A protein has these predicted regions:
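Bacterial N-terminal signal peptides
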Residues: 8-19
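Flexible, solvent-exposed loop/hinge segments and secondary-structure transition points
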Residues: 23-590
Length: 590
């Protein structure tokens, strides 16, 4: 109880930041060098989590802001997957938070389902639909991690980083061998089997997002909390293997670090919480006031009891963390392909994207009227990443996302990508779709991440899930034309679909999965697609906005944009496919 009481007092500083409005970390103090988590810090955080609860099934993990595993603790009753789930929820807290607004794994679940708000039928999908399929640890380049300008670890599983015995040879994570890919979850596939690789744990039950039609009962994993020091994100802590309320209780106490000064030093600015479409994003339980959170933390959850560190073992011994690199994390460099993007082209696209970001009003930063801080990536025709640029304090999950979005934007805009998508739509297990008209000979439609998201959900059009409301009195909602591709992606980490060969090499390594939420455009020279631009780090409309303006000079011909085409289901109903969606009044107000 000594640890829990000390932590409860300190953690209120963090909780204040998610509830009340006052001041905020000034823009000129956002990003830059931050104190790293030391091995002693990690041990203190895990000790607090361990002593908060005595459950024999508990596991806890600490990661730095890059998602690098710094320490994992588990009790004998924890099942095989629980330590990796703790790592995954810790990453969710660390990699989604920013210096101006703490977000937790509860927050991420709220904004990643088939409905927004969760549990309300016939409402649009949440912005980050499919987020569990990102950050699975896929290889970035055939040359390995040496292509990065600074150390930037891939978020793999414990065995993928340390080996089967958490200290031997690491296991790989690539299309041909995914044994070392991240193992969050548990989440089930379409056959009811546990998916082997889930990068981000939110509590999503299965690929159909079961439970989204039950207001107040949507499944969630709320045990991932960011760790702050001096107003800057330096890592995250995750607790798993216990009931949701217990995991959140222990993780939030542990985030205070037993009084070691880990705190969000200033409360958030107006309006005191991040709002999307007028809805307050949750951080801790159902609380919306400081009094509620304080009382919750000061009162031990019913039926729980304190624990001892000696009741478990360190699966991964505590170690020091890393800084999260900023600016050019990779590149800039030219494509090696004839007629491809030059280094000058790449720099121009990055510079344009950064300039647009700095004038774009952020959705996830406070106080309001702050600039968006994006992570931006450019890919060439081979899927080679030519640049990865992280603006100061950009969300770290966005690095994997931006690179993958860039690759997807190019690949699915090629003729090969078109044929793969057309075939999947035509052979959908539940509904057969016809995609018309066909693009010009030898070409594909110019496709974005928004297009892929729109047609890749278990409901089509997205959010429409009551079949009896339709004129034809359908017995059940229909899956999207590319929902089967989402299922394939969920089962097969680090691939771009069943036909992603890029010239016939099925083991091609320049693949890192598919991103199912918006923020990308293909890059063209004339009517030839030569690469892709991926943007991540704020609201998805803001990501689309920066993608569009950042790619100035490389837009597709209007006649090749996918919004010239429609999907038609077996009953003859037509749905036009979207290209981009831009925010209203996107720029910072003077």
């Amino acid at each position: 109880m000594r640890y829990a009481k000390a932590a409860a007092a300190g953690v209120l500083i963090l909780i204040l930041s998610s509830t009340l409005s006052s001041q905020n970390t000034p823009s000129d103090r956002v990003g830059g060098a931050a104190q790293i988590l030391t091995a002693d810090d990690v041990r203190a955080v895990l000790t607090t989590a361990a002593t908060a609860l005595g459950n024999d099934t508990l596991a806890a993990a600490v990661v730095d802001r890059t998602g690098n595993i710094l320490g994992v603790y588990a009790r004998p009753g924890a099942d095989e997957r629980t330590p990796d789930i703790a790592v995954s929820v810790a990453r969710t807290g660390a990699m989604f938070a920013n210096d101006q607004a703490p977000l937790s794994s509860r927050t991420v679940r709220f904004i990643s389902g088939t409905h927004f708000p969760p549990g309300i039928k016939n409402t649009p999908n949440a912005a980050l639909y499919g987020v569990e399929n990102i950050n699975r640890g896929c290889r970035v380049d055939v040359q390995g991690d040496a292509v990065f300008n600074a150390p930037f670890p891939r978020p793999k599983s414990i065995a993928g980083v340390f080996g089967e015995g958490a200290g031997s040879t690491p296991l790989p994570c690539e299309p041909s061998d995914t044994r070392g890919c991240a193992r969050g979850g548990p989440m089930l596939d379409d056959a009811g089997e546990t998916l082997p690789s889930v990068g981000i744990t939110t509590g999503k039950a299965d690929v159909f997002d079961a439970g989204q039609d039950q207001p107040g009962a949507v499944p969630v994993n709320p045990g991932g909390i960011p760790i702050y020091r001096g107003g800057k994100v330096i890592g995250g802590v995750g607790v798993a293997g216990v009931a949701a309320n217990l995991a959140e209780y222990a993780a939030t106490l542990a985030a205070a670090g037993s009084g070691r000064g880990m705190d969000f030093s200033e409360p958030l600015g107006k309006p005191g919480a991040v709002l999307i479409d007028g809805l307050r994003l949750p951080f801790f339980g159902t609380c919306t006031t400081i009094t509620c959170i304080r009382n919750t933390l000061r009162t031990r959850p019913a039926g729980s009891f304190p624990g001892q560190l000696s009741s478990g073992t360190f699966v991964v011994q505590p170690r020091d963390g890393l800084q999260a690199p900023e600016n050019y994390v990779l590149g800039p460099r030219a494509s090696s392909l004839a007629g491809g993007l030059s280094e000058e082209d790449v720099r121009r696209i990055i510079d344009q994207s950064v300039a647009v970001s700095l004038r774009t009003r952020a959705m996830i930063r406070l106080p309001i009227n702050q600039p968006a801080r994006m992570t931006i990536s450019v890919s060439d025709e081979a899927g080679t990443i030519l640049a990865l640029y992280r603006m100061a304090d950009g969300t770290v999950f966005s690095s994997d996302v931006a690179m993958t979005k860039a690759r997807n934007a190019y690949y699915f805009s090629t003729r090969e990508g078109y044929e793969v998508l057309r075939s999947i739509a035509a052979s959908s297990q539940q509904d057969k779709y016809t995609w018309t008209p066909e693009p010009p000979a030898g070409k594909g439609w110019a496709i974005t991440a928004r297009t892929i998201s729109f047609a890749g959900q278990p409901l089509f059009p997205p959010g429409i899930d009551l079949g009896e409301q339709l004129e034809e009195q359908d017995s059940e909602p229909q899956h999207g034309p590319w929902f089967d591709l989402y299922v394939f992606d969920s089962k097969n980490a680090c691939t771009e679909g069943p036909g992603a060969s890029r010239g016939g090499n099925r083991a091609f390594l320049n693949q890192s999965g598919i991103v199912w939420f918006p923020g990308s455009v293909p890059l063209y020279r004339g009517d030839r697609v030569i690469g892709g631009l991926g943007v991540s780090g704020d609201g998805v409309e803001q990501d689309d906005y920066v993608s569009l303006l950042g790619s100035d000079g490389f837009h597709p011909p209007d006649a090749l944009r996918v919004d010239n085409s429609v999907m038609t289901d077996a009953k003859g109903r037509h749905v036009r496919l979207p290209y981009l969606k831009l925010p209203r009044n996107p720029d910072i107000q003077k």
